[in-house]
UniProtKB/Swiss-Prot annotation:
Lineage, broadest ranks: Bacteria, Bacillati, Chloroflexota, Dehalococcoidia, Dehalococcoidales
Subcellular location: Cytoplasm
Single Gene Ontology MF annotation: tRNA binding
GO biological process assignments: D-amino acid catabolic process
Family, per entry: Belongs to the DTD family.
This protein's record includes keyword Hydrolase: yes
CDD domains found in the cross-reference section: Dtyr_deacylase
Record gene name: dtd
Protein name as catalogued: D-aminoacyl-tRNA deacylase
Keywords per UniProt: Cytoplasm, Hydrolase, RNA-binding, tRNA-binding
Organism (species): Dehalococcoides mccartyi (strain ATCC BAA-2266 / KCTC 15142 / 195) (Dehalococcoides ethenogenes (strain 195))
Enzyme class, first EC level, given as a word: hydrolase
Length: 153
């Protein structure tokens, strides 16, 4: 499971011209589910994202997390994060989870966030969406749940 997280001053997602999710200050999360991902991958990313200290304290240092500040999340599914571009010029998506499993894990991710007391707005799984993201910083971080299996030495 991969996530691109962006610290935002605000963000929204539209489907068919209608706003389906919006937040104020917090994090926009683009979430891609890969074949073989499990609940453990979702749990790892939820814990990492909501506790990642990427908000400035009074001295301007990254010492505060989304959870510390009671900020919001906007979670949008994005299977293209699982693209394999190693061969040729057309991305392959064969490593992305099947839609039913991806939808299940995407919704689990959202439930886990909400279970931690985090306000989480969402896009619509499988829909064509328009995102408006006001990146704050900018701060953009890429997380991969498989990294938990290979910690730094």
């Amino acid at each position: 499971m991969k996530a691109v997280i962006q610290r935002v001053s605000r963000a929204s997602v539209m489907v068919g011209g209608d706003t389906v999710g919006e937040i104020g200050p917090g994090l926009a999360v683009l979430l891609g589910v890969a074949e073989g991902d499990t609940q453990a991958d979702a749990e790892y990313l939820v814990s990492k994202i909501i506790n990642l200290r990427i908000f400035a304290d009074g001295e301007g240092k990254f010492n505060l997390s989304l959870k510390d500040l009671c900020r919001e999340l906007l979670v949008v599914s994005q299977f293209t994060l699982i693209a394999d571009t190693r061969k040729g010029r057309r991305p392959s998506f064969v490593e992305a989870a099947q839609p039913e499993e991806a939808d299940r894990l995407y919704n689990l991710f959202i439930r886990l966030c909400r279970g931690e007391g985090v306000q989480a707005a969402t896009g619509k799984f499988g829909a064509m969406m328009m995102l408006e993201i006001h990146n704050d910083g900018p701060v953009t971080i890429i997380l991969d749940s498989r990294d938990r299996l290979n910690p730094r030495q």
